[in-house]
């Protein structure tokens, strides 16, 4: 463990403090707060992350003194910190099973809105680092949870991601789950509204998906009204996919002349120019005096902002305000550099982190600091545009508050920042809400500014009608409210701004403006009339556009009715026509002026960009390929500081960068090395590897596509890469830099036949020691989890076929590395855990001795740490590890007679401990027991200890049996000299070096005297009997029956593999689909041992078969075999234990590849075969191992359902019930679907078992209950229910449950 400390407390010590029941909660709260501060402000040691997570999860369980809330905040900061420090994202991927359920369940906490928002932000950070893991967790947890609040918040979170982060968010993946949630909650309007908004935004960005969404919605059994609500947005998108022609037809005069097209285009240009002129009035232009600062890479960007952060902590003082201003100026320089284009997402993350500091700077009383902070916010909005939206929510409150400042410069700067945000961010309902609130402020400045913000929104709507989406009605209602209040405001400046904004409103929403006019008082209407005349076609608020709107006649009538002079004249119709013509001619000069000014301002930008520009989606007219130059010029018109499309900085970037990119693109497209490496032809790939090797030797610049191509080749044709790693050290290191550490180590493990010190030294020069240990553990995890491996199909097949080769190489590499390099406590624990998983995998292989050697090496490095880790290992595996290193178990009541007494022998760690033999000459006081011969293939009903069997069968005179056991047991040179006796604790023991059977003569007399004294010690037998005993010791087992081999699967697998290979060679069987189907038929027609052996050989030989056969088996063969097995079990006699057990072994092998078996038939087979068996029978242990190895989610849920139904029955068989309870104990500790109804159901089942006379029922129920309480994935409501039902039991029962919770 790393020695990194904070406040003189190491992470392990802090974990002990939080886990202790004796330490006061105040002390725990103080320590967790210190941990949160450490994570938030300091760079953490990533090796301590697992311990930090343990501390935080312990803290989440403590509801007192707000410890749970502080712990969750610490988790949020930890996720952010890891995402910043760990660029590979491996840590978050590894810990997703622990973190994501906490975050997702937090979304359903209605009592803590702040916690919900924090969970959303943490999920966002997590998704940016590990998108697949987050999406899978949401699918499995959020939409399967009965808490609808979680579902609603999840949909809202998706909407936020889609709008602000990525338009490529995979919404279709979640659509079936969302529609299913609506099916089961048809009256929940919140889900429907949230879903409608999500679909609307997604379809706006991906219109091609509309038809697919419609079909999916129609395929679900939803109410027609619900479909209409969801499909309303879809249909609107279908109609709105070509919105501009409708507007054009509505506003175009009788003929489609070129003049009318130009006029329509000028309308669009007018909105654009008017918006630019309005923004220039609030100082929107970017300051050109600040120099740009380029950043080398994303790491440098994060490190730079981390340096900025400390000065913004706490209050502003005389000593830190200048530092703050300096950092703000440097941020403005960074914003102008390459980070806004090359590291955009990282820059947004950094700004999000320092947003609080920006707000502090803007609120400063020092004018320069406040002004520079506001300028920074404005420039962030102009340059980053919609990417800034996640940060904007934290900036708006401070800025709007600053708008009310009595200090005019501060108020003006705040208005400038808010206007820039409104001009560049996508529309949300909160925008109009802020405008409404500001219009009600008692100070006149916020009221005036609110009209400017509303004016900006109206112009953006005029430019792009889809800007506000489906918020039309709420926007218009809020705008009417603002106009009704501010058109009659007491301040004349506010009234004038309101009039200008109103005339913009009439051009965008003419019908709504007309309805509003009828509601206004006469004096306000007259004031509007005067402002219309005074505008004179200039300024920012002209009365009309060139093309007349349908609402304008009604507006004229309203004004004419209130104009006495016009009413008294009553001119003839011809004069009326002339007057009407005059009214229409009033606004004509303005568009002409605007267009001419626009032409003059845009002549220079057009010179540098000769290519035809893309036309805005919001244009009023579609571009025509046959349009004249004049129309084309109008489409091209843009201002120099364009708001809606490009950052002004992009225009000033050096053109040399574009040329470089073009050259790079050209070279990559025509590079023969890239073409060869991406080919599917083996010869071309080899040629590409040779080209790459010579390119590396020649120190050429390699294209970026090489990395992904090499990863693909490493999975499909790894041996082709051998020249890269065997030529010389330089090519080795360069090739290593092109691969990820895990892929690099996997390639080395397969390319090199043996690892030596030179190779390991070279590997560690390429990747540091900690990364080497991490990658080695990752590879061992893949081997242990085969075939459930994440990644491509090629990677899965490679690991499955080469798992023993990879394991051997990695174990060799770890052995060499551990002898040369130090290992931290975290790495020590990770290596130990991976080795424990490999015991079952390697038990019956030749590499088991290598695994044992590595265990002993770890024990030599740190015996205390090793002993602590052994205590956490479960039962049988724990005994195996203790046996390997010679630790005497403290949990066993009697010592297994097959194990040696290490108390009598001093073992040197450097000695060869692989071979232990019995003394050939038993002493006179030895006890000797002769054992009967064991039947082949577990044919008899008795099962003996595997090591006893190995010793007995090693001395058997039968050549056939001797040959079989020689293959199963590890190779020993002294096998023919082994004794048939079983020695007790007083046996003579020797450790053989190279096969010798005599005691080591080099031991001195003192050692012999010490051993002799220990033997004759009269109190030694009594001390050996002092053991920790099980609390359910009253469950006596029949001591006459020998113990079952702890690794039945590995032992049975070894026997089958050896025997099957002999038979296969004899019968000349071939791995073909035809032969496989023939054997399946024979298995059904004539059930026998030979048919089982053949089928087992087919499954066992899958890893060495051809690719075609593997594809056949994984797609069709496994289902054919499953069907044949069910028919096999239905025909055989269940009393034939040998046949049943061998059939179960084949079924267990099949379940590794088939994740969708018939669970009902599986459970029926369990009941059929175990109904007459005892708890210590072979079949019981076989079934128990098979059930505990199930690891597919759907399969586990289905079997859990069957087990609960069985336990709810009236009459329960002890053996079957015990198997069901063991399985439930496994799954309940991590169950993500626990709700109150299921808790009461489980309580009914377990409560009934507490009153059973049979002790095994009571013990199993207690263990299940303790695992249920240890589940950390439950909601607070479920947690309270668990505590409530537990409190109803007697105190003795509660203590037993708490006892097992601590194990």
From Swiss-Prot:
<dbReference type="GO" id="GO:0072686">
    <property type="term" value="C:mitotic spindle"/>
</dbReference>
<feature type="compositionally biased region" description="Polar residues">
    <location>
        <begin position="955"/>
        <end position="972"/>
    </location>
</feature>
<dbReference type="GO" id="GO:0005876">
    <property type="term" value="C:spindle microtubule"/>
</dbReference>
<keyword id="KW-0132">Cell division</keyword>
<comment type="similarity">
    <text>Belongs to the CLASP family.</text>
</comment>
<keyword id="KW-0498">Mitosis</keyword>
<keyword id="KW-0493">Microtubule</keyword>
<keyword id="KW-0206">Cytoskeleton</keyword>
<dbReference type="InterPro" id="IPR016024">
    <property type="entry name" value="ARM-type_fold"/>
</dbReference>
<dbReference type="Pfam" id="PF12348">
    <property type="entry name" value="CLASP_N"/>
</dbReference>
<dbReference type="GO" id="GO:0090307">
    <property type="term" value="P:mitotic spindle assembly"/>
</dbReference>
<protein>
    <recommendedName>
        <fullName>Protein STU1</fullName>
    </recommendedName>
</protein>
<keyword id="KW-0539">Nucleus</keyword>
<feature type="compositionally biased region" description="Polar residues">
    <location>
        <begin position="618"/>
        <end position="629"/>
    </location>
</feature>
<dbReference type="InterPro" id="IPR011989">
    <property type="entry name" value="ARM-like"/>
</dbReference>
<feature type="compositionally biased region" description="Basic and acidic residues">
    <location>
        <begin position="634"/>
        <end position="648"/>
    </location>
</feature>
<feature type="region of interest" description="Disordered">
    <location>
        <begin position="239"/>
        <end position="259"/>
    </location>
</feature>
<comment type="function">
    <text>Microtubule binding protein that promotes the stabilization of dynamic microtubules. Required for mitotic spindle formation.</text>
</comment>
<keyword id="KW-0963">Cytoplasm</keyword>
<dbReference type="InterPro" id="IPR034085">
    <property type="entry name" value="TOG"/>
</dbReference>
<dbReference type="GO" id="GO:0005815">
    <property type="term" value="C:microtubule organizing center"/>
</dbReference>
<dbReference type="InterPro" id="IPR024395">
    <property type="entry name" value="CLASP_N_dom"/>
</dbReference>
<dbReference type="GO" id="GO:0005634">
    <property type="term" value="C:nucleus"/>
</dbReference>
<feature type="compositionally biased region" description="Polar residues">
    <location>
        <begin position="573"/>
        <end position="583"/>
    </location>
</feature>
<feature type="compositionally biased region" description="Polar residues">
    <location>
        <begin position="249"/>
        <end position="259"/>
    </location>
</feature>
<feature type="compositionally biased region" description="Basic and acidic residues">
    <location>
        <begin position="596"/>
        <end position="609"/>
    </location>
</feature>
<feature type="region of interest" description="Disordered">
    <location>
        <begin position="531"/>
        <end position="664"/>
    </location>
</feature>
<dbReference type="GO" id="GO:0005881">
    <property type="term" value="C:cytoplasmic microtubule"/>
</dbReference>
<keyword id="KW-0131">Cell cycle</keyword>
<dbReference type="GO" id="GO:0051301">
    <property type="term" value="P:cell division"/>
</dbReference>
<feature type="region of interest" description="Disordered">
    <location>
        <begin position="953"/>
        <end position="977"/>
    </location>
</feature>
<comment type="subunit">
    <text>Interacts with microtubules.</text>
</comment>
<dbReference type="GO" id="GO:0008017">
    <property type="term" value="F:microtubule binding"/>
</dbReference>
<dbReference type="GO" id="GO:0060172">
    <property type="term" value="P:astral microtubule depolymerization"/>
</dbReference>
<dbReference type="GO" id="GO:1990023">
    <property type="term" value="C:mitotic spindle midzone"/>
</dbReference>
<feature type="compositionally biased region" description="Basic and acidic residues">
    <location>
        <begin position="554"/>
        <end position="568"/>
    </location>
</feature>
<feature type="compositionally biased region" description="Polar residues">
    <location>
        <begin position="653"/>
        <end position="664"/>
    </location>
</feature>
């Amino acid at each position: 463990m790393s020695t990194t400390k904070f406040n003189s407390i190491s992470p392990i010590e802090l974990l002990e403090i939080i886990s202790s029941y004796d330490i006061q909660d105040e002390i725990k709260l103080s320590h967790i707060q210190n941990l949160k501060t450490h994570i938030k402000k300091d760079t953490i040691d990533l090796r301590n992350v697992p311990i930090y997570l343990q501390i935080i999860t312990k803290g989440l369980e403590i509801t007192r003194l707000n410890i749970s809330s502080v712990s969750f905040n610490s988790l949020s900061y930890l996720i952010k910190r890891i995402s910043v420090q760990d660029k590979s994202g491996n840590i978050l991927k590894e810990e997703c099973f622990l973190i994501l359920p906490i975050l997702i369940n937090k979304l359903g906490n209605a009592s803590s809105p702040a916690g919900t928002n924090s969970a959303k932000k943490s999920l966002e950070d997590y998704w940016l680092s590990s998108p697949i893991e987050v999406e899978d967790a949401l699918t499995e947890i959020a939409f399967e949870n009965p808490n609808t609040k979680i579902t609603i918040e999840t949909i809202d979170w998706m909407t936020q991601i889609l709008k602000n982060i990525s338009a490529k968010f995979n919404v279709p993946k979640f659509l079936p789950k969302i529609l299913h949630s609506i099916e089961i909650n048809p009256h929940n309007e919140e889900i429907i509204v949230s879903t409608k908004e999500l679909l609307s935004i997604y379809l706006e960005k991906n219109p091609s998906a509309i038809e697919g969404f419609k079909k999916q919605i129609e395929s679900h059994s939803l109410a027609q009204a619900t479909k209409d609500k969801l499909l309303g947005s879809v249909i609107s998108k279908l109609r709105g996919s070509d919105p501009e022609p409708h507007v054009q037809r509505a506003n175009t005069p009788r003929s489609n002349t070129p003049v009318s097209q130009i006029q329509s285009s000028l309308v669009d240009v007018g909105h654009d120019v008017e918006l630019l002129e309005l923004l220039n009035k609030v100082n929107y232009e970017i300051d050109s005096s600040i120099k740009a600062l380029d950043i080398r890479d994303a790491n440098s960007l994060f490190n730079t902002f981390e340096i900025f952060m400390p000065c913004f902590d706490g209050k502003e003082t005389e000593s830190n305000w200048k530092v703050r201003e300096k950092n703000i100026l440097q941020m403005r320089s960074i914003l102008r550099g390459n980070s806004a284009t090359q590291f955009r997402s990282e820059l947004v993350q950094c700004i999000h982190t320092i947003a609080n500091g920006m707000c502090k700077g803007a609120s400063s009383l020092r004018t320069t600091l406040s002004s520079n902070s506001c300028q920074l916010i404005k420039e962030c909005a102009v340059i980053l545009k919609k990417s800034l939206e996640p940060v904007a929510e934290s900036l708006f409150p401070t800025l709007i508050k600053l708008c009310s400042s009595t200090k005019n410069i501060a108020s003006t700067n705040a208005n400038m920042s808010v206007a820039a945000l409104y001009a560049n961010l996508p529309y949300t309902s909160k925008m109009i809400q802020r405008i409404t609130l500001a219009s009600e402020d008692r100070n006149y400045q916020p009221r005036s500014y609110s009209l400017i913000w509303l004016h900006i929104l109206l112009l953006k709507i005029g430019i792009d009608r889809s800007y506000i989406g489906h918020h039309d009605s709420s926007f218009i209602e809020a705008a009417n409210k603002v106009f009704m209040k501010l058109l009659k405001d007491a301040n004349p400046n506010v009234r004038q701004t309101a009039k200008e904004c109103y005339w913009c409103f009439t051009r965008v929403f003419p019908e709504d403006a007309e309805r509003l006019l009828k509601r206004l008082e006469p004096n306000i209407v007259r004031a509007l009339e005067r402002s219309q005349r005074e505008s004179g076609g200039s300024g920012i608020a002209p009365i009309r556009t060139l093309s007349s709107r349908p609402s304008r006649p009604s507006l004229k009538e309203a004004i004419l009715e209130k104009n006495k002079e016009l009413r008294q004249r009553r001119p003839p119709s011809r004069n009326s026509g002339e007057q009407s013509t005059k009214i229409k001619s009033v606004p004509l000069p303005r568009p002409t002026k605007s267009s001419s000014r626009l032409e003059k301002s845009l002549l220079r930008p057009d010179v540098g960009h000769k290519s035809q520009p893309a036309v805005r989606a919001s244009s009023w007219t579609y571009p025509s390929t046959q349009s004249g130059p004049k129309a084309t010029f109008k489409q091209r018109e843009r201002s120099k500081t364009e708001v809606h499309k490009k950052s002004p900085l992009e225009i000033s970037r050096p053109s040399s960068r574009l040329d470089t990119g073009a050259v790079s693109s050209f070279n990559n497209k025509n590079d023969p090395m890239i073409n060869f490496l991406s080919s599917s032809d083996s010869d071309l790939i080899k040629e590409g590897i040779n080209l790459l090797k010579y390119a590396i030797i020649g120190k050429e610049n390699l294209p970026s596509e090489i990395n992904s191509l090499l990863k693909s080749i490493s999975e499909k044709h790894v041996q082709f890469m051998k020249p890269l790693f065997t030529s010389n050290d330089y090519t080795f290191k360069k090739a290593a830099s092109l691969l990820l550490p895990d892929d690099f180590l996997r390639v080395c493990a397969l390319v090199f036949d043996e690892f030596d010190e030179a190779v390991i030294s070279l590997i560690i020069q390429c990747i540091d020691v900690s990364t080497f240990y991490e990658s080695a553990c990752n590879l061992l995890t893949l081997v242990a989890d085969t075939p459930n491996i994440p990644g491509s199909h090629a990677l899965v097949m490679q690991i499955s076929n080469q798992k023993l080769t990879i394991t051997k190489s990695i174990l060799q590499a770890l052995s060499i590395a551990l002898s040369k390099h130090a290992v931290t406590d975290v790495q020590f624990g990770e290596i130990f855990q991976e080795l424990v998983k490999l015991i079952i995998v390697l038990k019956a292989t030749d590499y088991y001795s290598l695994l044992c050697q590595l265990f002993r090496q770890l024990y030599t490095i740190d015996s205390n740490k090793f002993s602590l880790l052994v205590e956490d290992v479960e039962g049988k595996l724990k005994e195996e590890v203790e046996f390997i290193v010679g630790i005497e178990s403290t949990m066993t009541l009697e010592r297994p007679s097959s194990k040696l007494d290490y108390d009598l022998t001093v073992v040197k760690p450097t000695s060869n401990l692989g071979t232990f033999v019995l003394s050939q000459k038993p002493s006179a006081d030895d006890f000797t027991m002769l054992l009967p011969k064991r039947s082949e293939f577990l044919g008899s009903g008795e099962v003996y200890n595997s090591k006893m069997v190995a010793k007995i069968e090693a001395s058997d005179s039968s050549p056939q049996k001797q040959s079989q056991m020689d293959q199963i047991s590890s190779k020993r040179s002294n096998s023919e000299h082994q004794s048939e006796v079983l020695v007790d604790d007083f046996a003579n023991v020797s450790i053989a070096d190279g096969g010798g059977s005599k005691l080591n003569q080099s031991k001195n007399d003192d050692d012999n005297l010490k051993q002799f004294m220990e033997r004759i010690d009269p109190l030694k037998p009594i001390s050996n009997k002092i053991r920790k005993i099980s609390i359910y010791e009253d469950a006596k087992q029949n001591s006459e029956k020998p113990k079952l081999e702890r690794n039945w699967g590995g032992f049975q697998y070894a026997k089958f593999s050896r025997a099957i290979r002999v038979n296969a060679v004899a019968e000349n069987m071939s791995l073909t689909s035809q032969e496989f189907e023939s054997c399946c038929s024979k298995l059904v027609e004539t059930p026998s041992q030979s048919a089982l052996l053949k089928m087992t050989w087919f499954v066992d030989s899958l890893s060495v078969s051809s690719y075609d056969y593997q594809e056949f088996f994984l797609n069709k063969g496994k289902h054919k075999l499953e069907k044949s097995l069910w028919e096999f079990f239905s025909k055989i006699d269940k009393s034939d234990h040998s046949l049943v057990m061998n059939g179960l072994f084949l079924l267990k092998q099949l379940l590794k590849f088939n994740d969708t078996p018939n669970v009902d038939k599986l459970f029926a087979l369990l009941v059929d075969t175990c109904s007459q068996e005892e708890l210590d029978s072979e079949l019981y242990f076989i079934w128990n191992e098979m059930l505990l190895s199930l690891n597919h989610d759907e399969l586990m849920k289905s079997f859990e359902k069957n087990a609960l139904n069985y336990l709810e029955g009236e009459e329960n068989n002890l053996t079957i019930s015990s198997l069901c309870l063991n399985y439930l104990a496994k799954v309940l500790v991590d169950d993500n679907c626990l709700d109150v109804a299921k808790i009461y159901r489980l309580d009914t089942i377990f409560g009934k078992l507490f009153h059973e006379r049979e002790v095994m029922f009571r013990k199993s129920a207690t263990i299940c209950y303790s695992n249920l309480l240890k589940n950390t994935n439950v909601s607070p409501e479920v947690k309270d229910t668990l505590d409530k039902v537990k409190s109803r039991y007697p105190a003795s029962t509660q203590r037993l449950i708490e006892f097992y919770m601590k194990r």
